[in-house]
Design a protein with these regions (language model features):
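Short, surface-exposed beta-edge/turn micro-motifs
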Residues: 19-20, 158-160, 188-189
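Acidic, low-complexity central loop/insert segments
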Residues: 37, 58, 65-183, 234-283
């Protein structure tokens, strides 16, 4: 069956410098197995499938797949899917606010002149990382244990463990080696380090993780990680909102996710989204 398809670049103001997302606009009728197979074939970090909502509060529903599994929530797929839904003719109930239904529940999305922003979902795992885990993280990252300023669980779905290093240069210098990981299962690490005051961006972020084959991969720009990092950094007093982050530098990308915080404490993660490829796919 022929289905509408878009490939959207997310989180960069310039095409081809953000994080690409494959979006099957007409996802209804596909099985989970078909969705997973197509997601593996695209070889992108995530692929999404748009579906009719199951609740009247939502404008649309999305299912999000990595190469290996389905996720309840992910950030750049949220913004890219919202962009694709609107570009395909979707009309929200509220012109300035779109509500996405996904595995994590309902996610409100703002639309503004700079792009889209989603409300950071609650963390499902928080708290400090134990000493044994810190040792393992240092080994995987190829750095001394003393170079880790702090490490915290910051999981909003994918399983992120956040690692704070002394500065942005330290983050960019890391050469991860997941063959040193002895903890079993997958490992999703978010690295963050500050730029000097007055720089274009406040923080450098990297997302490194093991894929379904145990190989190391790096995500160009990661909304879910930037969301959980912002929640941690703001709550701990290490950051103040609004701020601009940088991600994808080591991959030759120019990701620029922005962070805002409402008076009630809600954290928003935003960025541009640009359709780079559109057409049909046989599924």
């Amino acid at each position: 069956m022929r289905r509408r398809f878009q490939q959207v670049d997310v989180f960069s103001p310039e095409p081809f410098l953000g994080n690409p997302l494959a979006v099957v606009v007409d996802g209804e009728g596909l099985s989970t197995e078909q969705m997973q197979q197509f997601s593996r074939w695209t070889n992108l970090s995530e692929t999404t499938f748009l579906l009719p909502p199951t609740t009247p509060e939502a404008d649309y529903r999305v299912r999000i797949f990595t190469l290996a599994r389905e996720l309840p929530f992910a950030g750049h797929p949220t913004l890219g899917s919202c962009h694709a839904w609107l570009a395909a003719g979707g009309v929200p109930r509220d012109a300035g606010r779109i509500v996405q239904e996904c595995g994590a529940g309902l996610v409100p999305i703002r639309r503004g002149e700079r792009g889209f922003a989603f409300a950071a979902p609650p963390l499902i795992r928080t708290g400090p990382v134990d000493g044994v885990m810190v040792d393992q993280l240092a080994s995987v990252l190829g750095i001394g244990r003393g170079e880790i300023v702090d490490a915290q669980w910051a999981d909003n779905g994918p399983g992120w463990v956040a690692v704070l290093l002394k500065d942005a240069d330290a983050v960019l210098a890391v050469e991860p080696d997941f063959s040193r990981w002895s903890g079993g299962g997958s490992l999703d690490i978010g690295l963050v380090g500050a730029y000097p005051p007055g720089a274009e961006c406040a923080w450098e972020v990297r997302a490194v993780f093991s894929d379904d084959q145990g190989a190391m991969r790096e995500d160009p720009v990661t909304g879910s990680l930037n969301a959980s990092l912002a929640q941690w950094l703001l709550a701990s007093g290490r950051a103040t909102a609004p701020y601009l982050a940088s991600q994808g530098t080591r991959l030759g990308r120019r990701g620029r996710p922005w962070i805002e915080q409402d008076a009630d404490g809600t954290v928003w993660v935003g960025g541009p989204a640009i359709t780079c490829i559109q057409g049909d796919v046989e599924l």
